Amino acid sequence: MGHQEEPPRICKTPSGHEQGEGPAEKTSKPSTEEVGWDGPTDPARPVNWSRKKKWWNMGIISYLTFLTPLTSSIVAPAQGLVMKDFHSTNRTLASFVVSIYLVGFAVGPLFLAPLSEIYGRLRVYQVGTFIFTIWNIAGAVAPNVGALLVFRLFAGISGSGPVTLGAGSVADMFARQERGVAMSLYGLGPLLGPVIGPIAGGYLSQAQGWRWVFWLLAIVSGVAVILVLFVLSESYEPVLLRQKAKRIRRENSSVEVNAGQALKLDSRKVFIQAITRPTKLLFLTPNVALFSLYTGVVFGYLYLLFTTVTEVYETTYHFSQGATGLVYIGIGVGALIGISCFGALSDKIQNILIARNNGQAEPEFRLPPLIPGSFLIPIGLFWYGWSTQMHIHWIMPIIGLGWVGCGMIATLLPIQAYLVDAFGEYAASAIAANTVVRSIVGAFLPLAGPSMYATLGLGWGNSLLGFVALGLLPVPVVFYFYGKKIRMNSRYQVSV
């Protein structure tokens, strides 16, 4: 968000009298003020907020980025109950009850990211969370599977805001050298949420029925509505400057005020530019395209596991529905280990590289943890696949899932931090493009899971996934060593 640049200033355009054109007349135009921040330490600027205010806001955003991904998987252990209740035995349709939510996650960012540039991040968080709550209530009373699919789709659209805008909010509030911990907290939700979801959903649906899964979601999202309405603050600088300009106009109507040339675009033009920006970045910039593909594969694997682990443990290890949810703890523990290792290393490694680079920061300095981290997901898939294929003790596949969880953190955190640093003011658009791709793959790859495992078995099926993941290893290596040259290449300078 330009935190490294000189902050905006208030510039006054003098009247004719001030320019030495003779005495001022009563009909002379009033002076014009261009509104900016009151110096580099202006406390109204989000990057200068108190530590307490920053982390209150960060905590709420992290809660949202935990809650909305949790909703994607919480119904996974209850797929059988849902289909039984609606008298269907279609396994692909059962998987789609889970994954259609991610179709909404793919559609939502295309609209919510540009709307945040017009109305601010806060308004999108508020309206989106309220509508998200409504769709969860609708899911609890769904009369048939078709209606449930529609409600899940719209819940995904309205719930995609926090994941799309969260990285931009981090960039708003934290200087580049301080973002590592905040990005780790933001990035933890999209991984821990889907892991904890099946644990809660398994026992709750077994005890109270699958509809109570949606009532629980409605309750916890209702709490989120209260937080975003009464505690969360706006952090998007252009919107804050527009608000400041309006406030000055009200207090002194004799002074013409604007919030900078870049902020005077009409809403329609801003919306069109912002809605096309993620598409341009996705198709015209190699870093966004390849890292979006990378995260798409990772999320596709995650949701493929979510939709198949339940059946594997019920049929192979004879777990109850509630106990099956506990299997996902393996991914959660792995994710926590990944956070403690890779989250802590992110800022340290970057600071070392900055010092070696004569104090000059580069986005590519976020990528070193991704290189060793790229081996973890293949290790986990081989471990999980062959453990289940050979019917080895049930703890062994869970350990394999732990490797997968750790690898996902090691993959997603550096990529998100890299995109935020590389695109600055347009970080939300880069993350939106990334979210669209990973959500589409996450929605549709699980549909191929049952037929793939039926043909190849759990061992070779998961090995195939592992080999594909290994094939992506050159991506972070290439961008670490040549990323700046690629970014500076005029062929990839996109007008956004």
From Swiss-Prot:
The chain crosses the membrane at residues 58-78, 93-113, 130-150, 154-174, 180-200, 212-232, 288-308, 325-345, 367-387, 395-415, 427-449, 463-483. Glycans are attached at N48, N90, N252. It comes from the Eukaryota. It is a multi-pass membrane protein. Residues 1-45 are annotated as: Disordered. GO terms for molecular function: transmembrane transporter activity. Residues 18-32 have a biased composition (Basic and acidic residues). Disruption phenotype: Has no significant effect on the synthesis of 2-oxocyclopiazonic acid, cyclopiazonic acid (CPA) and their biosynthetic intermediates. It is found in: Membrane. Pfam families: MFS_1. InterPro entries: MFS (IPR011701), MFS_dom (IPR020846), MFS_trans_sf (IPR036259). Its main location: membrane. One of its GO terms (cellular component) is membrane. Keywords: Glycoprotein, Membrane, Transmembrane, Transmembrane helix, Transport. Belongs to the major facilitator superfamily. MFS transporter; part of the gene cluster that mediates the biosynthesis of the fungal neurotoxin cyclopiazonic acid (CPA), a nanomolar inhibitor of Ca(2+)-ATPase with a unique pentacyclic indole tetramic acid scaffold. This is MFS transporter cpaT.
